[in-house]
From Swiss-Prot:
PANTHER family recorded: RIBOSOME-RELEASING FACTOR 2, MITOCHONDRIAL, TRANSLATION ELONGATION FACTOR G-RELATED
Protein name: Tetracycline resistance protein TetQ
Keywords carried by this UniProt record: Antibiotic resistance, GTP-binding, Nucleotide-binding, Protein biosynthesis
Residues the record lists as binding GTP: 10-17, 74-78, 128-131
Annotated PROSITE patterns: G_TR_1 (PS00301), G_TR_2 (PS51722)
tr-type G domain segment(s): 1-244
Amino acid sequence: MNIINLGILAHIDAGKTSVTENLLFASGATEKCGRVDNGDTITDSMDIEKRRGITVRASTTSIIWNGVKCNIIDTPGHMDFIAEVERTFKMLDGAVLILSAKEGIQAQTKLLFSTLQKLQIPTIIFINKIDRAGVNLERLYMDIKTNLSQDVLFMQTVVDGSVYPVCSQTYIKEEYKEFVCNHDDDILERYLADSEISPADYWNTIIALVAKAKVYPVLHGSAMFNIGINELLDAITSFILPPASVSNRLSAYLYKIEHDPKGHKRSFLKIIDGSLRLRDVVRINDSEKFIKIKNLKTIYQGREINVDEVGANDIAIVEDIEDFRIGDYLGAKPCLIQGLSHQHPALKCSVRPNKPEERSKVISALNTLWIEDPSLSFSINSYSDELEISLYGLTQKEIIQTLLEERFSVKVHFDEIKTIYKERPIKKVNKIIQIEVPPNPYWATIGLTLEPLPLGAGLQIESDISYGYLNHSFQNAVFEGIRMSCQSGLHGWEVTDLKVTFTQAEYYSPVSTPADFRQLTPYVFRLALQQSGVDILEPMLCFELQIPQVASSKAITDLQKMMSEIEDISCNNEWCHIKGKVPLNTSKDYASEVSSYTKGLGIFMVKPCGYQITKDGYSDNIRMNEKDKLLFMFQKSMSLK
Protein backbone atom coordinates (compact mmCIF):
# COMPACT_ATOMS: atom_id res chain seq x y z
CA MET A 1 0.00 0.00 0.00
CA ASN A 2 1.30 3.45 -0.93
CA ILE A 3 1.66 5.87 2.00
CA ILE A 4 1.67 9.66 1.79
CA ASN A 5 2.04 12.37 4.45
CA LEU A 6 -0.24 15.33 3.87
CA GLY A 7 -0.28 18.71 5.58
CA ILE A 8 -3.56 20.57 6.00
CA LEU A 9 -2.78 24.30 6.05
CA ALA A 10 -4.91 27.43 6.19
CA HIS A 11 -5.31 30.88 7.63
CA ILE A 12 -7.29 31.04 10.85
CA ASP A 13 -11.06 30.38 10.48
CA ALA A 14 -10.81 29.03 6.94
CA GLY A 15 -12.33 25.75 8.14
CA LYS A 16 -9.18 23.65 8.24
CA THR A 17 -10.16 21.38 11.11
CA SER A 18 -13.69 20.99 9.70
CA VAL A 19 -12.26 19.84 6.37
CA THR A 20 -10.01 17.35 8.17
CA GLU A 21 -12.94 15.96 10.16
CA ASN A 22 -14.93 15.52 6.94
CA LEU A 23 -12.03 13.68 5.31
CA LEU A 24 -12.00 11.29 8.28
CA PHE A 25 -15.76 10.76 8.11
CA ALA A 26 -15.99 10.36 4.33
CA SER A 27 -13.17 7.79 4.31
CA GLY A 28 -14.83 5.71 7.03
CA ALA A 29 -12.19 6.45 9.65
CA THR A 30 -14.83 7.87 12.02
CA GLU A 31 -18.48 6.98 12.53
CA LYS A 32 -19.58 10.60 12.84
CA CYS A 33 -18.19 13.90 11.66
CA GLY A 34 -16.69 15.96 14.47
CA ARG A 35 -17.68 19.62 14.67
CA VAL A 36 -15.54 22.45 16.00
CA ASP A 37 -18.66 24.08 17.46
CA ASN A 38 -19.51 20.91 19.37
CA GLY A 39 -15.96 20.38 20.65
CA ASP A 40 -15.88 16.75 19.48
CA THR A 41 -13.17 16.91 16.81
CA ILE A 42 -10.51 14.20 16.52
CA THR A 43 -7.60 16.38 15.45
CA ASP A 44 -8.13 19.28 17.88
CA SER A 45 -7.91 16.99 20.89
CA MET A 46 -6.63 19.43 23.53
CA ASP A 47 -9.35 20.98 25.71
CA ILE A 48 -8.10 24.46 24.92
CA GLU A 49 -8.25 23.74 21.17
CA LYS A 50 -11.84 22.56 21.41
CA ARG A 51 -12.88 25.50 23.58
CA ARG A 52 -11.21 28.22 21.50
CA GLY A 53 -11.78 26.59 18.11
CA ILE A 54 -8.13 26.92 17.02
CA THR A 55 -5.34 24.42 16.43
CA VAL A 56 -2.39 24.86 18.80
CA ARG A 57 -0.33 21.72 18.16
CA ALA A 58 0.05 19.77 14.92
CA SER A 59 -1.91 16.55 15.22
CA THR A 60 -1.61 13.40 13.12
CA THR A 61 -4.38 11.09 12.02
CA SER A 62 -4.79 8.63 9.16
CA ILE A 63 -7.26 7.60 6.46
CA ILE A 64 -7.34 5.12 3.60
CA TRP A 65 -8.78 6.14 0.22
CA ASN A 66 -8.38 4.53 -3.19
CA GLY A 67 -5.92 2.04 -1.70
CA VAL A 68 -3.63 4.82 -0.42
CA LYS A 69 -2.87 5.37 3.27
CA CYS A 70 -2.81 9.10 3.92
CA ASN A 71 -1.33 10.37 7.18
CA ILE A 72 -2.92 13.77 7.73
CA ILE A 73 -1.08 16.40 9.75
CA ASP A 74 -3.49 19.13 10.87
CA THR A 75 -1.37 22.20 11.58
CA PRO A 76 -2.02 25.46 13.47
CA GLY A 77 -3.42 28.30 11.41
CA HIS A 78 -2.29 31.14 13.67
CA MET A 79 1.01 32.95 13.10
CA ASP A 80 1.87 32.63 16.81
CA PHE A 81 2.43 28.90 16.22
CA ILE A 82 4.53 29.26 13.06
CA ALA A 83 7.35 27.16 14.56
CA GLU A 84 4.97 24.19 14.78
CA VAL A 85 4.03 24.70 11.12
CA GLU A 86 7.69 24.89 10.07
CA ARG A 87 8.45 21.55 11.75
CA THR A 88 5.55 20.00 9.85
CA PHE A 89 6.87 21.19 6.48
CA LYS A 90 9.96 19.02 6.88
CA MET A 91 8.01 15.77 6.61
CA LEU A 92 5.35 16.49 3.98
CA ASP A 93 4.86 14.74 0.66
CA GLY A 94 2.14 17.22 -0.23
CA ALA A 95 -0.28 19.75 1.18
CA VAL A 96 -3.84 21.01 0.98
CA LEU A 97 -4.04 24.78 1.36
CA ILE A 98 -7.54 25.82 2.38
CA LEU A 99 -9.05 29.20 1.52
CA SER A 100 -12.34 30.62 2.72
CA ALA A 101 -14.48 31.50 -0.30
CA LYS A 102 -15.83 34.52 1.57
CA GLU A 103 -12.70 35.93 3.26
CA GLY A 104 -10.38 34.95 0.41
CA ILE A 105 -6.61 35.23 0.59
CA GLN A 106 -5.23 36.43 3.92
CA ALA A 107 -1.68 37.40 4.85
CA GLN A 108 -1.15 33.98 6.45
CA THR A 109 -2.41 32.27 3.26
CA LYS A 110 0.14 34.06 1.14
CA LEU A 111 2.96 33.33 3.59
CA LEU A 112 2.07 29.62 3.73
CA PHE A 113 1.79 29.32 -0.03
CA SER A 114 5.07 31.13 -0.68
CA THR A 115 6.80 28.67 1.66
CA LEU A 116 5.17 25.66 -0.02
CA GLN A 117 6.21 27.08 -3.38
CA LYS A 118 9.78 27.74 -2.25
CA LEU A 119 10.12 24.20 -0.88
CA GLN A 120 8.47 22.73 -4.00
CA ILE A 121 5.87 20.82 -1.99
CA PRO A 122 3.02 19.58 -4.23
CA THR A 123 -0.06 21.53 -3.18
CA ILE A 124 -3.80 21.34 -3.79
CA ILE A 125 -5.79 24.52 -3.16
CA PHE A 126 -9.24 23.89 -1.68
CA ILE A 127 -11.79 26.73 -1.66
CA ASN A 128 -13.99 26.03 1.36
CA LYS A 129 -17.30 27.59 2.42
CA ILE A 130 -18.71 28.02 -1.10
CA ASP A 131 -22.17 27.88 0.52
CA ARG A 132 -21.67 31.27 2.20
CA ALA A 133 -23.80 34.21 1.08
CA GLY A 134 -21.99 36.90 -0.88
CA VAL A 135 -19.26 34.63 -2.26
CA ASN A 136 -17.70 36.01 -5.46
CA LEU A 137 -15.68 33.15 -6.96
CA GLU A 138 -14.62 35.06 -10.07
CA ARG A 139 -13.00 37.74 -7.93
CA LEU A 140 -11.39 35.05 -5.77
CA TYR A 141 -9.99 33.32 -8.87
CA MET A 142 -8.42 36.62 -9.90
CA ASP A 143 -6.97 37.09 -6.42
CA ILE A 144 -5.50 33.57 -6.49
CA LYS A 145 -3.76 34.29 -9.78
CA THR A 146 -2.58 37.71 -8.60
CA ASN A 147 -1.46 36.83 -5.08
CA LEU A 148 -0.58 33.14 -5.19
CA SER A 149 0.30 31.84 -8.65
CA GLN A 150 -0.64 32.00 -12.31
CA ASP A 151 0.06 28.27 -12.49
CA VAL A 152 -3.29 27.21 -11.04
CA LEU A 153 -5.69 24.80 -12.70
CA PHE A 154 -9.35 25.16 -11.73
CA MET A 155 -10.56 21.56 -11.80
CA GLN A 156 -14.26 22.22 -11.23
CA THR A 157 -17.09 24.60 -11.93
CA VAL A 158 -19.60 25.56 -9.24
CA VAL A 159 -23.31 25.70 -10.07
CA ASP A 160 -25.92 26.40 -7.37
CA GLY A 161 -23.61 25.24 -4.61
CA SER A 162 -22.64 21.96 -6.30
CA VAL A 163 -19.30 21.16 -7.92
CA TYR A 164 -18.80 19.59 -11.34
CA PRO A 165 -15.49 18.42 -12.89
CA VAL A 166 -14.14 20.13 -16.01
CA CYS A 167 -10.96 18.08 -16.21
CA SER A 168 -10.54 14.33 -15.68
CA GLN A 169 -9.00 11.18 -17.13
CA THR A 170 -11.81 10.94 -19.68
CA TYR A 171 -12.63 14.57 -20.45
CA ILE A 172 -10.72 17.84 -20.73
CA LYS A 173 -11.85 21.24 -22.02
CA GLU A 174 -9.97 22.90 -24.86
CA GLU A 175 -8.56 25.76 -22.76
CA TYR A 176 -7.18 23.20 -20.32
CA LYS A 177 -5.34 21.49 -23.15
CA GLU A 178 -3.66 24.81 -23.91
CA PHE A 179 -2.77 25.23 -20.23
CA VAL A 180 -1.05 21.83 -20.16
CA CYS A 181 0.79 22.54 -23.41
CA ASN A 182 2.12 25.79 -21.96
CA HIS A 183 3.59 23.85 -19.02
CA ASP A 184 4.97 20.73 -20.70
CA ASP A 185 7.24 20.72 -23.77
CA ASP A 186 6.56 17.08 -24.72
CA ILE A 187 2.81 17.58 -24.85
CA LEU A 188 3.32 20.86 -26.72
CA GLU A 189 5.41 19.13 -29.40
CA ARG A 190 2.78 16.43 -29.86
CA TYR A 191 0.04 19.06 -30.00
CA LEU A 192 1.85 21.12 -32.65
CA ALA A 193 2.54 17.96 -34.67
CA ASP A 194 -1.19 17.11 -34.62
CA SER A 195 -0.40 13.83 -32.88
CA GLU A 196 -3.22 12.13 -31.05
CA ILE A 197 -3.31 13.12 -27.38
CA SER A 198 -5.95 11.44 -25.24
CA PRO A 199 -7.57 12.98 -22.14
CA ALA A 200 -5.62 10.38 -20.14
CA ASP A 201 -2.36 11.73 -21.60
CA TYR A 202 -3.27 15.24 -20.49
CA TRP A 203 -4.35 13.92 -17.09
CA ASN A 204 -1.11 12.03 -16.50
CA THR A 205 0.86 15.12 -17.50
CA ILE A 206 -1.10 17.20 -14.98
CA ILE A 207 -0.28 14.63 -12.28
CA ALA A 208 3.42 14.90 -13.14
CA LEU A 209 3.29 18.72 -13.13
CA VAL A 210 1.57 18.79 -9.73
CA ALA A 211 4.12 16.32 -8.34
CA LYS A 212 6.89 18.72 -9.44
CA ALA A 213 5.05 21.67 -7.84
CA LYS A 214 4.79 23.36 -11.23
CA VAL A 215 0.98 23.38 -11.29
CA TYR A 216 -1.52 23.77 -8.44
CA PRO A 217 -4.99 22.22 -8.86
CA VAL A 218 -7.90 24.15 -7.34
CA LEU A 219 -11.00 22.41 -5.98
CA HIS A 220 -14.14 23.66 -4.24
CA GLY A 221 -16.46 22.57 -1.46
CA SER A 222 -18.11 23.17 1.87
CA ALA A 223 -17.01 21.18 4.89
CA MET A 224 -20.15 22.30 6.70
CA PHE A 225 -22.39 20.52 4.17
CA ASN A 226 -19.96 17.79 3.03
CA ILE A 227 -19.72 19.26 -0.47
CA GLY A 228 -16.65 18.43 -2.55
CA ILE A 229 -15.04 16.22 0.12
CA ASN A 230 -15.00 13.00 -1.92
CA GLU A 231 -13.61 14.92 -4.88
CA LEU A 232 -10.88 16.33 -2.64
CA LEU A 233 -10.02 12.81 -1.45
CA ASP A 234 -9.76 11.66 -5.06
CA ALA A 235 -7.49 14.60 -5.89
CA ILE A 236 -5.25 13.94 -2.87
CA THR A 237 -4.70 10.30 -3.79
CA SER A 238 -4.22 11.17 -7.48
CA PHE A 239 -1.90 14.17 -7.26
CA ILE A 240 0.15 13.59 -4.08
CA LEU A 241 2.65 10.81 -4.75
CA PRO A 242 4.75 8.85 -2.23
CA PRO A 243 8.53 9.41 -2.37
CA ALA A 244 10.75 6.71 -3.76
CA SER A 245 12.58 4.77 -1.06
CA VAL A 246 16.33 5.19 -1.41
CA SER A 247 17.58 2.73 1.19
CA ASN A 248 16.56 -0.21 3.35
CA ARG A 249 18.59 1.23 6.23
CA LEU A 250 16.52 2.74 9.04
CA SER A 251 16.22 6.51 9.05
CA ALA A 252 13.53 8.14 11.20
CA TYR A 253 12.81 11.76 12.18
CA LEU A 254 11.19 12.73 15.49
CA TYR A 255 8.73 15.54 14.78
CA LYS A 256 6.41 15.59 17.78
CA ILE A 257 6.38 14.84 21.52
CA GLU A 258 3.38 14.86 23.82
CA HIS A 259 2.55 13.63 27.32
CA ASP A 260 -0.61 11.66 28.05
CA PRO A 261 -2.72 12.31 31.18
CA LYS A 262 -0.68 9.72 33.10
CA GLY A 263 2.57 11.51 32.28
CA HIS A 264 3.86 9.02 29.70
CA LYS A 265 6.08 10.65 27.08
CA ARG A 266 4.84 9.83 23.56
CA SER A 267 7.20 10.39 20.62
CA PHE A 268 6.02 10.57 17.00
CA LEU A 269 8.48 9.65 14.24
CA LYS A 270 8.29 9.68 10.49
CA ILE A 271 10.10 6.64 9.05
CA ILE A 272 12.06 8.12 6.15
CA ASP A 273 13.70 4.88 4.99
CA GLY A 274 13.84 1.28 6.13
CA SER A 275 11.57 0.18 8.95
CA LEU A 276 11.36 0.32 12.74
CA ARG A 277 10.59 -2.94 14.53
CA LEU A 278 9.51 -3.85 18.02
CA ARG A 279 12.53 -4.77 20.19
CA ASP A 280 14.98 -3.07 17.79
CA VAL A 281 18.03 -1.47 19.42
CA VAL A 282 18.74 1.76 17.55
CA ARG A 283 21.18 4.67 17.76
CA ILE A 284 20.08 8.28 18.41
CA ASN A 285 21.69 11.02 16.30
CA ASP A 286 24.85 9.09 15.39
CA SER A 287 25.79 9.36 19.09
CA GLU A 288 26.79 6.69 21.54
CA LYS A 289 23.23 6.58 22.87
CA PHE A 290 21.17 3.52 22.00
CA ILE A 291 17.54 2.78 22.85
CA LYS A 292 15.42 -0.35 22.72
CA ILE A 293 11.97 -0.14 21.16
CA LYS A 294 9.80 -1.73 23.85
CA ASN A 295 6.45 -0.60 22.44
CA LEU A 296 5.40 0.45 18.96
CA LYS A 297 2.24 1.94 17.50
CA THR A 298 1.10 3.47 14.25
CA ILE A 299 -2.02 5.36 13.18
CA TYR A 300 -4.58 3.52 11.08
CA GLN A 301 -7.99 4.82 10.03
CA GLY A 302 -8.09 7.51 12.68
CA ARG A 303 -6.94 5.41 15.63
CA GLU A 304 -3.69 4.16 17.12
CA ILE A 305 -2.91 0.45 16.89
CA ASN A 306 -0.10 -1.71 18.29
CA VAL A 307 2.17 -3.14 15.60
CA ASP A 308 5.39 -5.14 15.29
CA GLU A 309 6.83 -3.00 12.48
CA VAL A 310 6.37 0.41 10.87
CA GLY A 311 7.63 0.80 7.31
CA ALA A 312 8.99 3.61 5.16
CA ASN A 313 7.02 6.87 4.96
CA ASP A 314 4.70 5.84 7.77
CA ILE A 315 4.28 7.29 11.27
CA ALA A 316 5.56 5.42 14.35
CA ILE A 317 4.69 6.18 17.97
CA VAL A 318 6.89 5.02 20.86
CA GLU A 319 6.45 5.73 24.56
CA ASP A 320 8.66 6.51 27.54
CA ILE A 321 11.96 7.23 25.75
CA GLU A 322 13.25 9.97 28.04
CA ASP A 323 16.31 10.80 25.92
CA PHE A 324 14.21 11.86 22.93
CA ARG A 325 14.00 15.49 21.81
CA ILE A 326 12.15 16.97 18.84
CA GLY A 327 14.47 17.01 15.83
CA ASP A 328 16.30 13.82 16.85
CA TYR A 329 16.73 11.01 14.35
CA LEU A 330 17.17 7.25 14.59
CA GLY A 331 19.59 5.34 12.39
CA ALA A 332 20.92 7.18 9.36
CA LYS A 333 20.58 10.96 9.25
CA PRO A 334 17.44 11.67 7.19
CA CYS A 335 17.31 13.78 4.06
CA LEU A 336 14.56 16.23 4.95
CA ILE A 337 13.15 19.20 3.09
CA GLN A 338 15.73 21.98 3.15
CA GLY A 339 15.39 25.74 2.76
CA LEU A 340 13.41 26.62 5.87
CA SER A 341 14.68 29.67 7.72
CA HIS A 342 13.60 29.13 11.31
CA GLN A 343 11.86 32.15 12.75
CA HIS A 344 13.00 32.94 16.27
CA PRO A 345 10.54 34.69 18.59
CA ALA A 346 11.08 38.44 18.82
CA LEU A 347 8.93 39.09 21.89
CA LYS A 348 9.31 38.19 25.55
CA CYS A 349 7.67 38.75 28.90
CA SER A 350 8.18 37.89 32.54
CA VAL A 351 5.99 35.31 34.24
CA ARG A 352 5.56 34.68 37.94
CA PRO A 353 3.29 32.41 39.96
CA ASN A 354 0.49 33.99 41.96
CA LYS A 355 1.87 32.00 44.90
CA PRO A 356 5.66 32.54 45.20
CA GLU A 357 6.14 29.06 46.69
CA GLU A 358 4.98 27.55 43.36
CA ARG A 359 7.92 28.95 41.37
CA SER A 360 9.60 25.53 41.04
CA LYS A 361 6.29 24.09 39.87
CA VAL A 362 6.11 26.74 37.12
CA ILE A 363 9.68 25.97 36.02
CA SER A 364 8.90 22.25 35.86
CA ALA A 365 5.74 22.89 33.84
CA LEU A 366 7.53 25.21 31.41
CA ASN A 367 10.24 22.58 30.95
CA THR A 368 7.59 20.01 30.00
CA LEU A 369 6.04 22.45 27.51
CA TRP A 370 9.53 23.15 26.10
CA ILE A 371 10.09 19.42 25.53
CA GLU A 372 6.83 19.36 23.55
CA ASP A 373 7.58 22.61 21.73
CA PRO A 374 11.28 23.63 21.53
CA SER A 375 10.33 27.07 20.22
CA LEU A 376 9.03 27.84 23.72
CA SER A 377 12.26 29.09 25.25
CA PHE A 378 12.38 30.37 28.79
CA SER A 379 15.20 31.55 31.02
CA ILE A 380 15.92 33.13 34.39
CA ASN A 381 17.10 36.73 34.14
CA SER A 382 20.52 36.81 35.80
CA TYR A 383 19.90 40.31 37.18
CA SER A 384 16.25 40.29 38.22
CA ASP A 385 15.94 36.53 38.83
CA GLU A 386 12.62 36.65 36.98
CA LEU A 387 11.33 33.89 34.71
CA GLU A 388 11.21 35.13 31.11
CA ILE A 389 9.43 33.47 28.19
CA SER A 390 10.13 34.20 24.52
CA LEU A 391 6.97 34.57 22.44
CA TYR A 392 5.69 34.91 18.90
CA GLY A 393 2.58 36.84 19.94
CA LEU A 394 -0.27 37.55 22.34
CA THR A 395 -2.30 34.45 21.43
CA GLN A 396 0.62 32.17 22.29
CA LYS A 397 0.95 33.90 25.66
CA GLU A 398 -2.73 33.32 26.39
CA ILE A 399 -2.44 29.65 25.41
CA ILE A 400 0.60 29.15 27.68
CA GLN A 401 -1.18 30.81 30.59
CA THR A 402 -4.23 28.58 30.11
CA LEU A 403 -2.10 25.43 29.84
CA LEU A 404 -0.25 26.28 33.05
CA GLU A 405 -3.51 26.81 34.91
CA GLU A 406 -5.56 23.92 33.51
CA ARG A 407 -2.97 21.25 32.80
CA PHE A 408 -0.46 21.94 35.58
CA SER A 409 -2.77 23.56 38.16
CA VAL A 410 -0.64 26.64 38.72
CA LYS A 411 -1.91 30.19 38.27
CA VAL A 412 0.53 32.75 36.93
CA HIS A 413 0.75 36.42 36.05
CA PHE A 414 2.36 37.67 32.83
CA ASP A 415 3.92 41.12 32.70
CA GLU A 416 3.74 43.37 29.67
CA ILE A 417 5.13 41.85 26.46
CA LYS A 418 8.46 43.39 25.38
CA THR A 419 10.24 43.41 22.05
CA ILE A 420 13.49 41.40 22.14
CA TYR A 421 16.32 43.78 21.27
CA LYS A 422 19.99 42.94 20.79
CA GLU A 423 23.25 44.80 21.40
CA ARG A 424 26.38 45.25 19.28
CA PRO A 425 29.65 46.96 20.27
CA ILE A 426 30.22 50.30 18.58
CA LYS A 427 34.01 50.27 18.21
CA LYS A 428 37.03 48.02 18.55
CA VAL A 429 38.46 47.91 22.08
CA ASN A 430 40.93 45.86 24.10
CA LYS A 431 40.69 45.17 27.82
CA ILE A 432 43.03 43.28 30.18
CA ILE A 433 42.70 42.22 33.81
CA GLN A 434 46.04 41.15 35.30
CA ILE A 435 46.72 38.33 37.72
CA GLU A 436 47.47 39.40 41.33
CA VAL A 437 46.39 42.98 40.66
CA PRO A 438 43.59 43.97 43.05
CA PRO A 439 40.68 43.56 43.02
CA ASN A 440 41.21 40.48 40.79
CA PRO A 441 40.59 37.45 43.06
CA TYR A 442 41.27 34.87 40.32
CA TRP A 443 44.57 33.19 39.43
CA ALA A 444 44.41 34.35 35.80
CA THR A 445 45.27 37.15 33.40
CA ILE A 446 42.87 37.63 30.50
CA GLY A 447 42.98 40.08 27.63
CA LEU A 448 40.05 40.35 25.20
CA THR A 449 39.57 42.40 22.05
CA LEU A 450 36.01 43.20 20.97
CA GLU A 451 35.17 44.53 17.53
CA PRO A 452 31.83 45.01 15.75
CA LEU A 453 30.91 42.86 12.73
CA PRO A 454 28.30 43.49 10.00
CA LEU A 455 24.68 43.02 11.03
CA GLY A 456 23.66 39.39 10.95
CA ALA A 457 27.21 38.05 11.31
CA GLY A 458 26.60 36.65 14.79
CA LEU A 459 29.33 35.86 17.32
CA GLN A 460 32.85 34.92 16.24
CA ILE A 461 35.49 33.81 18.76
CA GLU A 462 39.22 33.56 18.03
CA SER A 463 42.34 33.03 20.11
CA ASP A 464 45.83 34.46 19.69
CA ILE A 465 47.10 32.26 22.52
CA SER A 466 48.91 29.08 21.50
CA TYR A 467 47.73 25.80 22.95
CA GLY A 468 51.37 25.09 23.74
CA TYR A 469 51.28 27.87 26.32
CA LEU A 470 47.67 27.55 27.57
CA ASN A 471 46.02 24.20 27.00
CA HIS A 472 42.57 23.45 25.60
CA SER A 473 40.71 23.18 28.90
CA PHE A 474 41.80 26.68 29.97
CA GLN A 475 41.02 28.24 26.59
CA ASN A 476 37.68 26.44 26.34
CA ALA A 477 36.82 27.91 29.73
CA VAL A 478 37.45 31.40 28.31
CA PHE A 479 35.28 30.63 25.26
CA GLU A 480 32.49 29.41 27.56
CA GLY A 481 32.78 32.63 29.56
CA ILE A 482 32.52 34.70 26.37
CA ARG A 483 29.38 32.89 25.22
CA MET A 484 27.86 33.28 28.66
CA SER A 485 28.74 36.98 28.71
CA CYS A 486 27.04 37.53 25.36
CA GLN A 487 23.71 36.45 26.84
CA SER A 488 23.32 39.81 28.59
CA GLY A 489 24.92 43.09 27.53
CA LEU A 490 24.90 46.58 29.01
CA HIS A 491 21.11 46.80 28.71
CA GLY A 492 20.39 43.16 29.44
CA TRP A 493 19.96 42.03 25.82
CA GLU A 494 21.96 39.45 23.89
CA VAL A 495 25.22 40.79 22.46
CA THR A 496 25.70 39.78 18.84
CA ASP A 497 27.44 40.64 15.57
CA LEU A 498 30.89 40.91 17.13
CA LYS A 499 34.29 39.27 17.04
CA VAL A 500 35.95 38.47 20.37
CA THR A 501 39.66 37.64 20.33
CA PHE A 502 41.45 36.10 23.31
CA THR A 503 44.67 38.16 23.18
CA GLN A 504 46.55 37.76 26.45
CA ALA A 505 46.87 35.12 29.17
CA GLU A 506 48.94 34.41 32.26
CA TYR A 507 48.60 31.70 34.88
CA TYR A 508 50.43 30.21 37.84
CA SER A 509 50.88 26.53 37.25
CA PRO A 510 50.46 25.30 40.85
CA VAL A 511 47.20 27.13 41.56
CA SER A 512 45.47 28.32 38.36
CA THR A 513 42.47 26.32 37.14
CA PRO A 514 40.08 26.57 34.15
CA ALA A 515 37.46 27.82 36.62
CA ASP A 516 39.62 30.91 37.30
CA PHE A 517 39.58 31.75 33.59
CA ARG A 518 35.89 30.92 33.19
CA GLN A 519 34.88 33.16 36.09
CA LEU A 520 37.14 36.10 35.21
CA THR A 521 36.14 36.25 31.53
CA PRO A 522 32.71 37.92 32.06
CA TYR A 523 34.35 40.80 33.96
CA VAL A 524 36.89 41.44 31.19
CA PHE A 525 34.13 41.21 28.60
CA ARG A 526 31.88 43.59 30.52
CA LEU A 527 34.57 46.22 30.98
CA ALA A 528 35.46 46.02 27.29
CA LEU A 529 31.82 46.38 26.31
CA GLN A 530 31.44 49.43 28.55
CA GLN A 531 34.50 51.00 26.94
CA SER A 532 33.14 50.33 23.46
CA GLY A 533 29.53 51.26 24.10
CA VAL A 534 26.74 49.49 22.26
CA ASP A 535 24.23 50.05 19.50
CA ILE A 536 20.76 48.75 20.27
CA LEU A 537 19.43 46.51 17.50
CA GLU A 538 15.72 45.99 16.93
CA PRO A 539 13.96 43.19 15.01
CA MET A 540 12.86 44.07 11.49
CA LEU A 541 10.13 42.65 9.29
CA CYS A 542 10.22 42.45 5.51
CA PHE A 543 6.73 43.37 4.37
CA GLU A 544 4.57 43.21 1.29
CA LEU A 545 1.47 45.38 1.36
CA GLN A 546 -1.24 44.99 -1.25
CA ILE A 547 -4.08 47.48 -1.04
CA PRO A 548 -6.70 49.07 -3.30
CA GLN A 549 -5.22 52.05 -5.13
CA VAL A 550 -7.60 54.45 -3.39
CA ALA A 551 -6.05 53.53 -0.02
CA SER A 552 -2.44 54.02 -1.10
CA SER A 553 -2.00 57.51 0.38
CA LYS A 554 -3.10 56.37 3.83
CA ALA A 555 -0.88 53.29 3.60
CA ILE A 556 2.22 55.32 2.73
CA THR A 557 1.49 57.77 5.56
CA ASP A 558 1.10 54.85 7.98
CA LEU A 559 4.35 53.27 6.84
CA GLN A 560 6.23 56.53 7.31
CA LYS A 561 4.84 56.85 10.85
CA MET A 562 6.03 53.30 11.55
CA MET A 563 9.55 54.31 10.39
CA SER A 564 9.53 51.78 7.57
CA GLU A 565 12.00 51.66 4.69
CA ILE A 566 9.96 51.52 1.47
CA GLU A 567 11.92 49.69 -1.22
CA ASP A 568 9.39 49.45 -4.06
CA ILE A 569 5.95 50.80 -4.98
CA SER A 570 4.03 49.62 -8.04
CA CYS A 571 0.44 50.66 -8.79
CA ASN A 572 -2.12 50.17 -11.52
CA ASN A 573 -5.68 51.45 -11.83
CA GLU A 574 -6.94 49.15 -9.06
CA TRP A 575 -4.11 47.97 -6.81
CA CYS A 576 -0.90 49.12 -5.19
CA HIS A 577 1.93 46.79 -4.11
CA ILE A 578 4.42 48.18 -1.61
CA LYS A 579 7.52 46.33 -0.40
CA GLY A 580 10.04 47.23 2.27
CA LYS A 581 11.19 46.79 5.86
CA VAL A 582 9.49 47.91 9.04
CA PRO A 583 10.38 47.63 12.75
CA LEU A 584 8.43 44.91 14.54
CA ASN A 585 7.83 47.21 17.49
CA THR A 586 5.90 49.78 15.42
CA SER A 587 3.93 47.37 13.23
CA LYS A 588 2.59 44.68 15.60
CA ASP A 589 -1.10 45.41 14.94
CA TYR A 590 -0.91 46.79 11.41
CA ALA A 591 -2.31 43.68 9.66
CA SER A 592 -5.66 44.13 11.42
CA GLU A 593 -5.59 47.87 10.66
CA VAL A 594 -5.08 47.15 6.96
CA SER A 595 -7.98 44.71 6.97
CA SER A 596 -10.14 47.35 8.65
CA TYR A 597 -9.45 50.36 6.41
CA THR A 598 -9.55 48.30 3.19
CA LYS A 599 -12.71 46.40 4.27
CA GLY A 600 -10.91 43.08 4.09
CA LEU A 601 -9.35 43.64 0.66
CA GLY A 602 -5.82 44.57 1.77
CA ILE A 603 -3.07 42.12 2.65
CA PHE A 604 -0.11 42.95 4.91
CA MET A 605 2.33 40.04 4.80
CA VAL A 606 5.49 40.05 6.90
CA LYS A 607 8.41 37.79 7.68
CA PRO A 608 11.44 38.32 9.95
CA CYS A 609 14.45 39.81 8.17
CA GLY A 610 17.06 40.30 10.84
CA TYR A 611 17.96 43.22 13.07
CA GLN A 612 19.10 46.79 12.48
CA ILE A 613 20.14 49.72 14.66
CA THR A 614 17.03 51.12 16.28
CA LYS A 615 15.77 54.55 15.32
CA ASP A 616 13.27 54.62 18.15
CA GLY A 617 13.26 54.19 21.90
CA TYR A 618 13.84 50.83 23.53
CA SER A 619 13.38 49.16 26.88
CA ASP A 620 16.11 47.75 29.09
CA ASN A 621 16.04 44.11 30.09
CA ILE A 622 17.92 44.74 33.33
CA ARG A 623 17.38 46.39 36.68
CA MET A 624 20.17 48.93 36.59
CA ASN A 625 20.33 49.39 40.37
CA GLU A 626 21.35 45.76 40.86
CA LYS A 627 25.14 45.76 40.45
CA ASP A 628 27.73 43.07 40.89
CA LYS A 629 30.02 44.19 43.75
CA LEU A 630 33.17 42.80 42.14
CA LEU A 631 32.30 44.46 38.83
CA PHE A 632 31.87 47.75 40.69
CA MET A 633 35.34 47.32 42.22
CA PHE A 634 36.86 46.56 38.80
CA GLN A 635 35.17 49.64 37.34
CA LYS A 636 36.47 51.79 40.17
CA SER A 637 40.03 50.50 39.86
CA MET A 638 40.02 51.05 36.10
CA SER A 639 38.78 54.62 36.52
CA LEU A 640 41.74 55.38 38.81
CA LYS A 641 44.29 54.42 36.15
